[in-house]
Amino acid sequence: MLKGKTVLLGVTGSIAAYKIAYLASALKKLHADVHVLMTKNATNFINPITFESLTGNKCLVDTFDRNFQFQVEHVSIAKKADVVMIAPASANVIGKLAHGIADDMLTTTVIACKCKKIISPAMNTNMFENPIVQDNLKILEHYGYEVIQPASGYLACGDTGAGKMPEPQTLLAYIEKEIACEKDLKGKKILVTAGPTQEAIDPVRYITNHSSGKMGYSVAKAAMLRGADVTLVSGRTAIEPPMFVKVVPIVTAKEMFDAVISVSDEQDIIIKAAAVADYRPAVVSSEKVKKKDGEMSIALERTDDILKYLGEHKKENQFLCGFSMETQNMVSNSRAKLEKKNLDMIAANNVKEKGAGFQGDTNVLTLITQEEETSLPLMSKEDAANQLLDKILMLTSNQN
């Protein structure tokens, strides 16, 4: 995902410095070229050799290191960087950067960088809330730095409050958002639905389906990484929601209908990947239905057809994509759904096909429009999401 990208990590003197080893490792696994800059104070918390072993690059600490490679090192690295993250960022380094002080390898390099800069403060609560530190952070924001607000919790000093550096996965998400993809969906508003709905029978039982939400979540994350403003309306899943996506949690089909139509008019693209119940119990018991001898029947009634409503009320130049899960006659059934519900495209898959369908991490999609069918091979749901977005981008470009 990050192949060909260069990431600079600036590490300052903080007990949280050890966490950056995990971040450096995660970035390497995504094939980024990772360079680490450390203040001398940071070397008291973690050895530079750790970062050199993880990244395969020399860890830079000393501005006057004689073992240079016939380049002005802080300038040459600054030129190749795609993004800089200073984490953990001490009050000292925040103050230096805010006022243009460049007196070590980290600060001279960061000030020489023209790329996006992200800074993650980490310190005692009283230090973080000090008006001087807050003013310095505002100065950095004014100059284009993105400031990650620290988490709250138990701190190394024994206090409890704001000042904790976020976990490496959160820091990684900020970097991915910045450089993982070309921002070819920037300026687009995209609504994605995902996951199952649950229709209560009584306070204990409900009707649902096997949807994990993985496909919809993959689409939402991919669209966000490509620069879109994404809203995700999601049923209950076991998946961590993607960062930088507005998530609207729902339970029932009625709740999903209301959530979707409340924002549908403002969307450029709607991708309905949720598995919504077609039927719900006509009457929901307020008490647990007791087991009885013999069979039990439950009267069902139709739920609102969200996709049909969206097709009937589609605004001009809005792109509407549905999903179709079939067990037989996949293409003909999906094409009928495309036409009946006034869709621009439908992503069809056969639940019986190996590697496709619910729960798994892969999918096999056929993208169907009025004019053509595009069959995709077995691939990860992340890759399938990007293929889906590529197709939508191509079709919407042709519309314009």
Give the location of each predicted region.
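A cross-family phosphate/adenosyl-ligand binding-site feature
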Residues: 1-118, 124-213, 217-400
